[in-house]
Amino acid sequence: FAITIQPVSLAAGYPDSYVTNDILWYKENDSTTCSGSSSNGVSGSDNQEKIWGYLRNAGLSAEQTAGVMANIQAESGFSPTRHEVGQGWGSGGWGLAQWTFGRRTLIANKIPSELKKYYSQEYGGAPNDKGMVDSIPVEDNDKLLIFELEYLVQEGKERPVTASGFGTASNSWELLKTLKTVDDATVFWHDDFEKSAMTKDDVKNIRGTAAQKIYERFNGTGGSGGGCSSSN
């Protein structure tokens, strides 16, 4: 299958309302085309293994991948349709990274038509231990993973670095790729991309512990994933 999303990158003069809604990347008339399939885009016995393989294939080290995945685990339990607990439909976070406010609106508007039906509270509950929702076919689960992971990577490449103490780079994704340890990758991705209310100590203790377990499980394995091309 083929997925077309329309990412936007930071540009001077973008609407003030985007800032207040946490939309930090915007580029008018830009488009990104991504393609993949459940057979060669992601592979594995559970969503954890599939996400690991995709992110490794996207160019992250094992340490960086573990850091991103620990944040995904804390946010959504690896479910691409997770809806934030305690929030009415349309409010709070949604998806692997729990995109919220204007960021949620942007990704929701780009969900491929064949997958739109899963953007529903019906599928927003807690996943099973494989990170999957039992009522979603594996093929569609994998398509959702590919779509959201492609979106996450592209957003990271277009998003300016806002977290302090990790150095400088042209965007969040490039800075992430400079980090050498699991702890640094975990804290940076939280502070720069997720931006939850957790303190830095809690991030290290809770998400950092999860990241280390992910690293120990998957280190030494590679991945397979689709790709994106951007035009403007």
Regions found by a protein language model. Name each.
Residues 49-53, 57, 66-69, 150, ...:
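Solvent-exposed, polar/charged alpha-helical surfaces in well-ordered, non-transmembrane soluble domains
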Residues 18-50, 57, 76-181:
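Peptidoglycan-targeting cell-wall enzymes and recognition modules
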Residues 62-79, 190:
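Short, functionally critical alpha-helical segments immediately adjacent to catalytic or ligand/cofactor-binding
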Residues 56, 60, 73-77, 157, ...:
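Hydrophobic/aromatic-lined pockets within catalytic cores
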Residues 171-223, 228:
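Active-site or metal-binding loop neighborhoods of secreted/extracellular toxin and effector enzymes
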